[in-house]
From Swiss-Prot:
Residues 1-31, 118-145, 236-269, 494-754 are annotated as: Disordered. SUPFAM superfamilies: Cysteine proteinases. The gene is creB. This is Probable ubiquitin carboxyl-terminal hydrolase creB. Transmembrane segments: none annotated.
Length: 754
């Protein structure tokens, strides 16, 4: 019995010994971000900083600064010029400095601190007199706010210090920018978060407009930063002795070709900012009086263009160089004419920059609202661009540009909103930089910010850098190869549990979508995959991470539709479903055709009614013109008729007096002139009274003729009499008077009056 109890105690659970410590829980592991998955096969860290992808902490409405700094860092020639001027700091010195500025996070400690803060908050809410605690919604792990918070808790934090003395320069905005770039380049971590506190302190100290926490303009900051860098570099160069100053501009192109090693060339010239960003505009003005053309050059660091609805960058540039008429108050002072003259003005580009910063003027001042208003015009921007509005003597007028960065403004107006940057890196495609969060995106994601609906994200500043046609062709070939590889991977492999594809550089796919396993290839053998299949959809966590207001991907719905990946559990499409689908398509097409025909019929009826109304209007105008002509003729006849005729007619109209034909009156007048030898007036018989009681004068008729018989003359006789009268001009004047003989009426006609 004792042995049995001992065996039970031996087989039972071991009792903890006195003083033994309980087993510790394993520390929580931070979640793996999409960026970390993309960088798993990067290899060794480079010394030029091209493989570093750091976010930037937002210190309250500093997103305008973060987005512009990210775009400038990933401009390879600009980054190399900043790091290598005036000299490049040795990597060893930078690594020693980073030992104190680069701090790695303790994820477990951060979680414990957060849990302790939550408990303290709950305890404070339970105190008597405290306001009732509002029920909190669970955190959305796909939101950008949650991702930014997790990045601040898990990723290394990089502080920047003032190292201007090591550069041999006084502290300025350029030296603080150099501190940022060198810290990232020398970091042994590919990912992390920069704290640009020192840079912001210098910016606010030197420029009062950035001292407030108000929303700032990213384009204004870009222009100010480039001008400040130029001013700081030239000011330091002026302090150096003459032999150590900048080289001639002819050597500046070679001096900016920098390598990534610590002993690389340095941009000895101070014009490296001009060589990269500066272009030259030529204003051509032609006087319309003397036709003399005058030219005036001006430089620019960024090009601002006006926008039009449903247009493109090319059309905006065409409008920028369109001819402008200078007239009225804007007349041009012509030196050749010596005064103000009307002229035509046109802007052309004389020298193209290596990096073209294109500012889309989305904020326009309106007189009605008396303030700036954001324009949500749809403006399409291409991946590759050629500028056509160049002068005839321009250097390299066929220069080809490629889009490498887009600064996006999210918000309904210029006084609030959020800025993010979408940047094309050297080896890892396009990345979204949203303050602390950095995520890979697809190439088509860049096309979601044309800006055609209010309240959504719009491209604000476009960065184009020079490239060659060979590089573009090589890139397209590489994209086709990657696309074919991704299609093969979809056919032969499966996705990970989190939905991220194995092939690097591709966007996330929906985790709900699955692909066929290798064991069932026959199910989809009848599907023919095109080699130019579109890329996959972004991951849902990627699409949801850009919610408003700090999220540009609210326009993710505008992404072109992509055929979904077939589900492994779905059955093949049956013939019945195919027939019903085709019937629906045919019914839809028939419905659209009938609607179009109905609309055309309505338009035809509207056009016909418009033609009828126009015809009626023209008829009314013709009738009114005839009536006005008759009235004016009657008035003219009354003015030119003899006084005795006016007295005897007692107000008869011209129509009553003019009832006789002109040929009849000519014939009768000829007979009167022949019968009268003394050119004296023949007594006129009184005409019977007219309808209104007035009497008309009547000429004396030859023997054997009556007024009625005279009216029976044929047309031929009348024409002969007219011809004889016209051939005998001596009878045109009567007697010794210089006036034309007046003709009297013998016949009353009331038909026209009636």
């Amino acid at each position: 019995m004792g042995s049995f109890l001992r065996s039970l105690r031996r087989d039972g659970p071991p009792t903890p010994s006195v003083g033994a410590t309980p087993a510790k829980k394993e520390p929580p592991v931070p979640p793996v971000t999409p960026l970390e998955k993309m960088l798993q096969d990067m290899g060794a860290i480079r010394e030029d900083g091209s493989d570093k992808f750091f976010g930037m902490e937002n210190y309250g409405n500093t997103c305008y600064c973060n987005s512009i700094l990210q775009c400038l860092y990933y401009s390879v020639p600009f980054r190399e010029a900043v790091v290598n001027y005036p000299t490049r700091t040795p990597i060893e010195s930078l690594e020693a400095a980073l030992a104190n500025t680069l701090r790695y996070q303790n994820f477990a400690a951060n979680l414990e601190a957060e849990a302790l803060a939550e408990k303290q908050k709950a305890a404070n809410a339970q105190r008597p007199g405290a306001p009732p605690n509002q029920p909190q919604k669970p955190e959305d792990k796909d939101s950008p706010e949650y991702k930014k918070k997790m990045a601040l808790q898990t990723l290394p934090l990089l502080e920047t210090k003032n190292n201007a003395t090591s550069y041999g320069m006084s502290e300025s905005l350029f030296t603080s920018l150099k501190d940022l770039f060198e810290s990232v380049v020398a970091s042994q971590s590919r990912i992390g978060i920069i704290r640009p506190q020192h840079f912001l302190d210098v910016l606010r100290r030197e420029h009062e407009m950035f001292r407030t926490a108000m929303h700032q303009d990213a384009h204004e900051f870009l222009n100010l930063l480039l001008n400040e860098v130029v001013a700081n570099v030239e000011a330091e160069a002026s302090k150096q002795p003459e032999p150590e100053r900048s080289l001639p501009p002819a050597e500046s192109a070679d001096s900016t070709e920098l390598s990534g090693s610590s002993g690389s060339k340095t941009p000895n010239t101070t014009r490296w900012v001009h060589e990269l960003f500066e272009g030259t505009l030529t204003s051509e003005t032609q006087c319309l009086t003397c036709e003399k053309v005058s030219q005036r050059d001006e430089v620019f660091l960024d090009l601002s263009v006006d926008l039009e609805q449903h247009s493109s960058v090319t059309s905006c540039l065409r409008k920028f160089s369109a001819e402008e008429m200078l007239c009225e108050r804007n007349k041009f002072h012509c030196d050749n004419c010596g005064g103000l003259q009307e002229a035509e003005k046109r802007m052309k580009i004389k020298r193209l920059p290596r990096i073209l910063a294109l500012h889309l003027k989305r904020f326009k001042y309106t007189e009605d609202l008396q303030r700036l208003q954001k324009l949500f015009h749809r403006v399409v921007y291409p991946y590759h661009l050629r500028l056509f509005n160049t002068t005839d003597d321009a250097e390299d007028p066929d220069r080809l540009y490629e889009l490498y960065a887009v600064v996006v403004h999210i918000g309904g107006g210029p006084y609030h909103g959020h800025y993010v940057a979408i940047i094309k890196t050297q080896d890892r495609g396009w990345l979204l930089f949203d303050d602390e969060m950095v995520e890979p995106v697809d190439k088509n994601y860049v096309r979601n910010f044309f800006g055609d609906r209010p309240g959504l994200a719009c491209a604000y500043v476009l960065f184009y850098q020079e490239t060659t046609l060979e590089a573009v062709m090589k890139e397209q070939e590489q994209e086709n190869m990657d696309l074919n590889t991704s299609v093969a991977d979809i056919n032969d492999s499966t996705l990970k549990q989190n939905g991220y594809p194995l092939s690097p550089g591709l966007a996330h796919v929906h985790s709900a979508s699955q692909i066929p396993s290798p064991s069932e290839p026959a199910r989809f053998s009848n599907l023919q995959r095109a080699p130019t299949a579109p890329p996959l959809f972004p991951h849902p966590e990627h699409a949801d991470s850009e919610s408003s207001p700090a999220d540009p991907s609210t326009t993710a719905s505008a992404t072109p539709p992509v055929p979904p990946i077939p589900d492994i559990h779905s059955l093949p499409l049956s013939p019945k479903k195919s027939d019903s689908h085709f019937k629906k398509e045919r019914a839809k097409e028939e419905k659209e055709r009938k609607a179009n025909e109905k609309e055309k019929e309505k338009q035809r009826r509207r056009d016909q009614e418009a033609r009828i109304r126009e015809q009626r209007r023209e008829d009314a105008e013709i009738r009114a013109a005839l009536e006005a002509s008759k009235a004016s003729k009657a008035e003219e006849d009354r003015r030119h008729s003899p006084d005795d005729t006016k007295k005897s007619s007692h107000g008869l109209s011209r129509l009553k007096r003019g009832s006789k034909s002109f040929s009849h009156r000519l014939g009768k007048d000829k007979e009167n002139r022949v019968s009268s030898s003394s050119h004296s007036a023949t007594p006129i018989a009184e005409h019977p009274p007219s309808r209104n009681g007035a009497s008309e004068s009547q000429q004396q008729l030859p023997n054997g003729q009556s007024p009625g018989s005279h009216g029976l003359h044929t047309r031929h006789t009348g024409l002969d009499e007219e011809r004889d009268t016209l051939k005998d001009p001596k009878h045109d004047r009567s007697g010794h008077h210089g006036k034309w003989r007046s003709f009297s009426l013998k016949k009353k006609s009331f038909s026209i009056l009636s």
